[in-house]
Amino acid sequence: MQRYFAKDYDKNLVLENSDIHHIKNVMRMKMGDLIEVVYNNKLYICRIDSFDPFSLNIDRVIEE
C-alpha cells in the first residue's frame, strides 16, 4: 500500500499536487483503492472516492 503525507486537514486530508499526480498517473490507482495517509503523526487508511482533474477525494477508513 502506498503512503503519502498530508499537508493539511480541513474537513479532508489535503495532499500535494505532485502526490495526486503520482496516485493518478504513475500508480494508476482507481476508485476504491486504499492508500495510507500520514498527518500529525497519525496514520489513516483511506479509500479513493473520486478523482477530479486537479484533486482527489478520499474517505478515511481507519485511523491508527
Q: What role is predicted for each listed range?
A:
Residues 1-64:
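N-terminal positively charged helical leader segments and presequences
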